[in-house]
């Protein structure tokens, strides 16, 4: 679960991390009241969306007075911001965060993520902070410095000093950086985060370090023990289909193709999308029905896939390990009848009771194309998508 910047900075403040004063508005009428809470004669105005790249997309601006602030709010509130991290529709802007400014001398990058290979938290720091950190990682990886944090002990002061030294900070700034490092480490572990990012972490002309931006992602599996964080979730930032899928424990991610995919298992789902691309098709989604697929969940999966008007064919790829293929076959038939599917459905079953499942499909009166292999299923789906441009059976 992602947090907005203003929510992340509230957490930063709670953990003693240096941030500038800021306030959020949800309507143009609130702009004057919000700015009255802040000092200075100019402010940073930031669209609040769950995506990076806001600055390059025009979603961050330095406003010089109240009128310019109101104009920025009028332009963006209720609109959608498209960045390189969003789809072509972008994400809705429901809040604008206004923040006091500071005189920047240098910009740094600081983040922490879970490294599953080492089973530790990895802190990453770089002297090249700002909007182009992705290019830094690709073109000059030697500018990225890392330390591993044991989750049993948390961050240790010497590790913060080690990073500060590599960033070229002075002794006074070294102490500030170490305090920030320790605070982020406590925040990361105590709140079960999967990502925390400060980009940029700035050094002001007065010699102080300030977290000028903040990004936080919380591990969804830990939300049950963080009710305070769960209450901060902004469902408007989620794709409506993804939000609906969560209700039925379906893992769904919308894409921009025309071949709807329903698969059990995340790895098999990714492999299915790869082979669809290999055969010249375009997957419309990632959808993992999980190991405990039932008739009801299969039906809901069909409904969610078909809410995408661009879907011209549905490819069902099931490997029966935990789940039985005969139950999946019955679920597919029931779903097609219940939902009234009007696009071709291609089904590939393998594993437990696969032959029984294929027989059930063959003996049904539902127009379903069955395949003996994933390659055959993919070819059928790609060809059907090309032929079925109007979305109806031929």
From Swiss-Prot:
What InterPro entries does this protein map onto? Answer: ATP-grasp_succ-CoA_synth-type (IPR013650), ATP_grasp_subdomain_1 (IPR013815), Succ-CoA_synthase_bsu_CS (IPR017866), SUCC_ACL_C (IPR005811), Succ_CoA_ligase-like_bsu (IPR005809), Succinyl-CoA_synth-like (IPR016102)
Designated name of the protein = Succinate--CoA ligase [ADP-forming] subunit beta
Under Gene3D superfamilies, the record lists: ATP-grasp fold, A domain, ATP-grasp fold, B domain, Succinyl-CoA synthetase domains
Cofactors required? Mg(2+)
Q: What is its EC number?
A: 6.2.1.5
GO biological-process terms attached to the record: succinyl-CoA metabolic process; tricarboxylic acid cycle
Which keywords accompany this UniProt record? ATP-binding, Ligase, Magnesium, Metal-binding, Nucleotide-binding, Tricarboxylic acid cycle
Q: Which organism is it from?
A: Haemophilus influenzae (strain PittGG)
């Amino acid at each position: 679960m992602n947090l907005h910047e203003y929510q992340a900075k509230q957490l930063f403040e709670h953990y003693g991390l240096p941030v500038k004063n800021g306030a959020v508005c949800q309507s143009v009428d609130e702009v004057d009241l919000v700015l009255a809470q802040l000092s200075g004669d100019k402010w940073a105005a930031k669209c609040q969306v769950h995506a990076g790249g806001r600055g390059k997309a025009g979603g961050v601006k330095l406003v010089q007075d109240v009128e310019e602030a109101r104009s920025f709010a009028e332009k963006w509130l209720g609109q959608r911001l498209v960045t390189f991290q969003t789809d072509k529709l972008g994400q809705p802007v429901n809040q604008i965060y206004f923040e006091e400014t500071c005189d920047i001398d240098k910009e740094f990058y600081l983040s922490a993520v879970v490294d599953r290979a080492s089973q530790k938290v990895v802190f990453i720091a770089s002297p090249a902070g700002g909007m182009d950190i992705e290019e830094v990682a690709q073109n000059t990886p030697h500018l990225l410095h890392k330390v591993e944090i044991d989750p049993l002990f948390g961050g240790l002061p010497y590790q913060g000093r080690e990073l500060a030294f590599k960033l070229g900070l002075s002794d006074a700034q070294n102490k500030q950086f170490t305090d920030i490092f320790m605070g982020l480490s406590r925040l990361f572990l105590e709140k079960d985060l999967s990502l925390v990012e400060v980009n940029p972490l700035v050094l002001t002309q007065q010699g102080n370090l300030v977290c000028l931006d903040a990004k936080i992602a919380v591990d969804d599996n830990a939300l049950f023990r963080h009710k305070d964080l769960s209450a901060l979730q902004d469902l408007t930032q989620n794709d409506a289909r993804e939000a609906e899928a969560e209700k039925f424990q379906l893992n769904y991610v919308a894409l921009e193709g025309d071949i709807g995919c329903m698969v059990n298992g995340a790895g098999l789902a990714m492999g299915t999308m790869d082979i669809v691309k290999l055969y010249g098709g375009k997957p419309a989604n990632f959808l993992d029905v999980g190991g405990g697929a039932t008739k009801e969940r299969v039906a809901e999966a069909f409904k969610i896939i078909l809410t995408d008007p661009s879907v011209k064919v549905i490819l069902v790829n099931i490997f029966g390990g935990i789940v039985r293929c005969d139950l999946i076959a019955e679920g597919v038939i029931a779903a097609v009848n219940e939902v009234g599917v009007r696009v071709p459905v291609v089904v590939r079953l393998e594993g437990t009771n696969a032959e029984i499942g294929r027989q059930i499909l063959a003996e049904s009166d539902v127009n379903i194309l069955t395949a003996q292999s994933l390659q055959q299923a993919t070819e059928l789906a790609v060809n059907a998508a090309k032929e079925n441009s109007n979305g109806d059976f031929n």
